[in-house]
Amino acid sequence: MEEKVGNLKPNMESVNVTVRVLEASEARQIQTKNGVRTISEAIVGDETGRVKLTLWGKHAGSIKEGQVVKIENAWTTAFKGQVQLNAGSKTKIAEASEDGFPESSQIPENTPTAPQQMRGGGRGFRGGGRRYGRRGGRRQENEEGEEE
């Protein structure tokens, strides 16, 4: 099922959206608890609002301002009271048709906000990061959505 940006909430998994890229940064490397990772950031939106998108790994730097893209299997987090969308190794991003899609100037400025209890400065807990194998051992996903 496809979501609208205005309906995004923290800790959603398997998120599918079609959005226009309003701003896009170049890829850069950052240090995380799992080592050096490549990311880029973008502001994307639809007729219901706009959201910050963090592109991890192979997706970093892959989208350009003005494009309309379909994003499949993304996830959301909360940071400083705002919902953020994330695209990792299991996410698919493809260019989509612009037919009938709002122009950048028609996309509202509003952004989805996190509930009051999730307004900390750190990365929101995704809840789905834990995976249990046949032996009951816990496996954790990193920022790119890959199991460790």
From Swiss-Prot:
One of its GO terms (molecular function) is DNA binding. CDD domains: SoSSB_OBF. Its main location: cytoplasm. One of its GO terms (cellular component) is cytoplasm. Residues 90-148 are annotated as: Disordered. It comes from the Archaea. SUPFAM superfamilies: Nucleic acid-binding proteins (SSF50249). It is found in: Cytoplasm; Chromosome. Keywords: Chromosome, Cytoplasm, DNA-binding. One of its GO terms (biological process) is response to ionizing radiation. Residues 103-116 have a biased composition (Polar residues). InterPro entries: NA-bd_OB-fold (IPR012340), SOSS-B (IPR051231), Ssb-like_OB (IPR048970). Residues 19-88 bind DNA. Residues 128-137 have a biased composition (Basic residues). The keyword Cytoplasm applies. Binds to ssDNA, binds approximately 5 nucleotides per monomer, binding may be slightly cooperative. Inhibits the endonuclease activity of XPF. Stimulates reverse gyrase from S.shibatae strain B12 (rgy). Monomer in solution, may bind ssDNA as an array of monomers. PANTHER family: OB FOLD NUCLEIC ACID BINDING PROTEIN-RELATED (PTHR13356), SOSS COMPLEX SUBUNIT B HOMOLOG (PTHR13356:SF0). This is Single-stranded DNA binding protein Ssb.
